[in-house]
Amino acid sequence: MGEYLTLPMEVYSGILVTHEGVFHGDLIVEEMAFEESRVEKDDFVISPTFFNAHTHLGDAALREAPRLDLVSIVGPGGYKHRMLSQIDSKTLRQEVELEVRISRDAGTSHFLDFREGGKAGLEIVKGIDGVLPLARPTSVEEAEEVEAFGFAYSSARDHDLKLMEEVREIARRRKMLFAIHAGEKDCADVDAALALEPDFVVHMNSCPEKIREFVEAEIPIVSCIRSNAFFGLLNKKSYELLSEYEKWMLGTDNAMISTASMLDEMHFAAYLIGKEKAILRAATASYAVFGFRHGYVVFNRNCSFRRTSDPLLTLVRRAGVKDIERVLIL
């Protein structure tokens, strides 16, 4: 008896779940568009794909990191840099590709990846679908020449301020992003970060009193909540403030600590701070902030969504790869 091949559907009828509401209609695969309907349809649950606004994907070669403090793990000369220096570039690339494939299968389409290691570090992720590399130049000359989506630095306390100011200007001239970490451990590096007028800043968990200044300047802020938890730096007050900000985004930070899947990040965030609607917005806001179009994730109703009273809550709190029928990425 022959085997039967089930071809993917070209239309998925159901509900589209976004932070703006729930809509009945049809997802037309060929057009990558959702068409609303006046008729209630609920065969599938559909959501936008997710955008990971902060990763260090090369760290995937170091699964799992030991329980040390922030500086000992990721600071200059710390565990991460010592261990990565012992791994060849081919292995690093293979681990990045694996982490990206796993996360894309879970609905995360794009990754803003903070790259270390100069041009060699950029080569590790070159050509990997969905990875948007942000370089960390160590000289003005390197910043002028490097081909990347933008530039990104760790804490202002780790780098020469004059160099970062010059790279910031180069980013403007070359129409590239400029990003920086700030407020992860304390407030000491926040004013310097703010003065650089970055296109977005990562963390701010330990400095809630300065969040308003970034909001008033309309500078997007990325939270990496599982990473904060790992380092003992959770601050619910900061996340609650950020949940009210339309330019709040989510990332996953170091792949040696957390998976790069935004489903996993949303699950953790939901149980820590609630505000599931804001969390879903933060997992998809980066498309608009950085000028990309989202795709769609089609979930079946066989498991998590089977008898749900609220599909948005199920999506943010518990939906997993077992529930995914198809991921459509532009």
Swiss-Prot record:
It comes from the Archaea. GO terms for molecular function: hydrolase activity; metal ion binding. Zn(2+) binds at H54, H56, H181, D253. Its EC number is 3.-.-.-. InterPro entries: Metal_Hydrolase. Keywords: Hydrolase, Metal-binding, Zinc. Belongs to the metallo-dependent hydrolases superfamily. ATZ/TRZ family. This is Putative aminohydrolase AF_1775. It comes from Archaeoglobus fulgidus (strain ATCC 49558 / DSM 4304 / JCM 9628 / NBRC 100126 / VC-16).
